[in-house]
């Protein structure tokens, strides 16, 4: 009887645990309780030399009048090799926020997809979208969960931006590998070419930029980053490959069409050719 009672108690505890996991508004928490092996982070790697993996490089973001913009180049590198010229590093997190990734590409893309599901799951369970602050905090917790792998060389550093209806303005958040979250008030950049992109934005960004002017500044800053950082790919005129750029306003997120970016790139090239500068 005692063993049967213990068995019932154990089964009861399992049922309670499963019900609690199923009712949580956090999909990541549910997964960590029911199938932790499916999470892209929080697992130790076996000892040995890490193989080379593709890395995403430069992301830029800035506020403008009525919203926020995020842009990323198209190159992924693996050591000294170009792993991809077509990679996309900026994604819509939901209808009113976007996410840019730098670092280990495979992990970063998995975390991005998990974050998208996390926001969708919360809205379905709670019946209302998570606030922008809440989204930023959830992303920070996910980055913190990847810390064991970051300490082994597989770091993911995101950039998060969205429109905050409570403040009627775009907001921008950066992170470190420990999940620390920092709000950036004007513009920011992450990745190997970030120091050059940030220098360009310091000169070109100004308060009250229009959306079209912000797109110009983003393209200029990625041009500068690619000029000095071999891991950042500039606009590719031969292959007609332009950066991926999203804007987020009160009306939601919008991906800038490639044909519009082609026109912007041509204007930037003409302007730089007219200056005739070496660097």
Curated annotation (Swiss-Prot):
Its EC number is 3.4.25.1. The keyword Hydrolase applies. Residues 1-56 form a propeptide. Pathway: Protein degradation; proteasomal Pup-dependent pathway. It catalyses: Cleavage of peptide bonds with very broad specificity. GO terms for molecular function: threonine-type endopeptidase activity. Gene3D superfamilies: Glutamine Phosphoribosylpyrophosphate, subunit 1, domain 1. One of its GO terms (cellular component) is cytoplasm. GO terms for biological process: modification-dependent protein catabolic process; proteasomal protein catabolic process. The formation of the proteasomal ATPase ARC-20S proteasome complex, likely via the docking of the C-termini of ARC into the intersubunit pockets in the alpha-rings, may trigger opening of the gate for substrate entry. Interconversion between the open-gate and close-gate conformations leads to a dynamic regulation of the 20S proteasome proteolysis activity. The active site is at residue 57. Its main location: cytoplasm. Belongs to the peptidase T1B family. Component of the proteasome core, a large protease complex with broad specificity involved in protein degradation. The 20S proteasome core is composed of 14 alpha and 14 beta subunits that assemble into four stacked heptameric rings, resulting in a barrel-shaped structure. The two inner rings, each composed of seven catalytic beta subunits, are sandwiched by two outer rings, each composed of seven alpha subunits. The catalytic chamber with the active sites is on the inside of the barrel. Has a gated structure, the ends of the cylinder being occluded by the N-termini of the alpha-subunits. Is capped by the proteasome-associated ATPase, ARC. NCBIfam families: 20S_bact_beta. This is Proteasome subunit beta. It comes from Renibacterium salmoninarum (strain ATCC 33209 / DSM 20767 / JCM 11484 / NBRC 15589 / NCIMB 2235). The lineage of its organism: Bacteria, Bacillati, Actinomycetota, Actinomycetes, Micrococcales.
